[in-house]
């Protein structure tokens, strides 16, 4: 498995570039990355790593701040 959630991470870069780095306009793609990463950690364990995903503790905080649950899509 190479770089899980890379597609979602690249979508964030594309979105930010096309919206002059206004992250508010990219909230949906950011949420999609967090949901993908949550699934990645659920499937592979919290000791797994992907360069595209924040560490599990930060991911949990970000998902809580954005009111996301792992089952969202």
Swiss-Prot record:
A motif (Cx9C motif 2) lies at residues 26-36. SUPFAM superfamilies: Cysteine alpha-hairpin motif. It comes from Saccharomyces cerevisiae (strain YJM789). The keyword Hydrolase does not apply. Keywords: Disulfide bond, Mitochondrion, Repeat. This is Cx9C motif-containing protein 4, mitochondrial. One of its GO terms (cellular component) is mitochondrial intermembrane space. Residues 2-44 form the CHCH domain. The twin Cx9C motifs are involved in the recognition by the mitochondrial disulfide relay system. A motif (Cx9C motif 1) lies at residues 5-15. InterPro entries: CMC4, Cys_alpha_HP_mot_SF. PROSITE patterns: CHCH. Belongs to the CMC4 family. The lineage of its organism: Eukaryota, Fungi, Dikarya, Ascomycota, Saccharomycotina. It is found in: Mitochondrion intermembrane space. Gene3D superfamilies: CytochromE C oxidase copper chaperone (1.10.287.1130). Disulfide bonds join 5-36, 15-26.
């Amino acid at each position: 498995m190479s770089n899980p959630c890379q597609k979602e991470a690249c979508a964030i870069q594309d979105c930010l570039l096309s919206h002059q780095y206004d992250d508010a306009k990219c909230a949906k793609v950011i949420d999609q990355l967090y949901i993908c990463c949550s699934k990645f950690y659920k499937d592979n364990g919290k000791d797994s790593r992907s360069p595209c995903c924040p560490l599990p503790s930060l991911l949990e905080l970000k998902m809580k701040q954005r009111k996301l649950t792992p089952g969202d899509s």
